[in-house]
Amino acid sequence: MRRCEEPQRRNRRDHHRDEPVRLGVGHVARDRHQRREDQQRPGVPTVSAQGHGRHRRDEDASVDNERDHPRLSHSVGR
């Protein structure tokens, strides 16, 4: 019985770890996530620079990608 419960609990915890950070999450967790993202791609303005605009920062990143690599543009018709 105990052996059956263990993997389920681990799977549920993994599922929560993979969830994207939502607004309304505590600022400590969001800042930690933000720091990790900034290390991955430097030069992109942080969340604190433009309010809580997560989608807007990703849009700026796609604009940069479009300028540097035209073939990789995800926004068609811009």
UniProtKB/Swiss-Prot annotation:
Record region (Disordered): 1-78
Compositionally skewed regions (Basic and acidic residues) per UniProt: 28-40, 56-71
Top-rank taxon, per record = Viruses
| Name of protein | Gene product 34
What is the taxonomic lineage of the source species? Viruses, Duplodnaviria, Heunggongvirae, Uroviricota, Caudoviricetes
The gene from which this protein is expressed is 34
